[in-house]
Amino acid sequence: GDRVAMRALMRSRNFDAVIHFAGHIVVPESVSDPGKYYRNNVLGSLNLIECCEESGVGLFVFSSSAAVYGNPATIPVHEETPTNPINPYGRTKLITEWTLKDFAERTGSNLPLRYVALRYFNVAGASLDGALGQATPEATHLIKVACEVACGQRDSVSVFGTDYNTEDGTCI
């Protein structure tokens, strides 16, 4: 994020909290271009966290991801499920969670940071004009793909995995 613009905005208003939804989210792209994800998701988040601190904003909601779990040993996952991200996207989300934890637990700060990290599974949504969200042709998210199949724009939905504890071994 643009730290100068963020700092100016935060100082011009009296914000109580920040809800951080920004970030790159395409897993295959994170594998092919990890630097893009670390620069945007980790450094951008750090800039925002530091701007919050400088501006006296002590409440922070972070849009993390279930990708921080990787391939969990047990299903369903819960808050105590061990994290083990398997791609750069998941790692950037976990690093940002750790960063928030470190700022929250830090000693000597005049402003204690209180935060929550929300670990979503399949997020859906887009602006009506298609400028934001999963309305792009290359988006691979389950809900978007399933809607495309239902509308006849795609032939099928791929289901990955065959070793789940279900009747047919799939995750469904």
Positions of PLM-derived features:
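NAD(P)-dependent short-chain dehydrogenase/reductase
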Residues: 101-172
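N-terminal Rossmann-like NAD(P)+-binding domain of SDR-like oxidoreductases, especially those catalyzing
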Residues: 1-126
